[in-house]
């Protein structure tokens, strides 16, 4: 699994691989001090979690307990820097509801713009998807 972070306040980006299947490794990989990020299955055929944050505490972390999770069918083209129309709508909805950030999850992690093509993939769920859905739902509001 590969995790990529968007630029933080200092303009730095981050990317690294996580090989352990433990939830603690996933939690460590999702560094919420970055305002955006995404977890991918190498070579980015599957996207497991995408996040955006906009409301932060004085120490730079997202407001605790103020991140919501959206669950869609399958991811499209959004990544840690560029949203797609669905992610943009979810960001706007989360802001309107008063959240300080959001996670985007999907029932199937395979990245495909056409759901019919996604269904033909031999492994549309991805090996880390269920574990990461449980983890993110446990830390969201």
Predicted regions and their residues:
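Glycine/proline-rich loop-helix segments at beta-alpha junctions forming the active-site rim
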Residues: 2-10, 20, 32-33, 112, ...
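Charged/polar, solvent-exposed surface patches and flexible loops
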Residues: 52, 92, 131-135
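Short catalytic helix/loop segments, enriched in acidic residues and glycine
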Residues: 87-95
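Amphipathic coiled-coil/heptad-repeat helices and related helical stalk/stem segments
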Residues: 86-87, 129
């Amino acid at each position: 699994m590969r995790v990529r972070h968007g630029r933080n306040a200092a303009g730095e980006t981050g990317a690294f691989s996580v090989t352990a299947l433990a939830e603690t490794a996933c939690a460590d990989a999702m560094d919420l001090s970055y305002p955006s990020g995404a977890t991918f299955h190498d070579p980015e055929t599957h996207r497991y979690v995408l996040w955006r944050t906009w409301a932060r505490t004085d120490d730079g972390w997202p407001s605790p307990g103020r991140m919501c999770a959206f669950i869609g069918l399958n991811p499209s083209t959004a990544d840690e820097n560029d949203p797609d129309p669905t992610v943009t709508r979810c960001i706007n909805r989360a802001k309107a509801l008063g959240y300080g950030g959001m996670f985007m999850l999907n029932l199937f992690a395979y990245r495909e713009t056409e759901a019919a093509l996604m269904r033909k993939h031999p492994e549309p769920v991805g090996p880390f998807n269920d574990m990461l859905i449980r983890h993110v739902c446990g830390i969201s509001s």
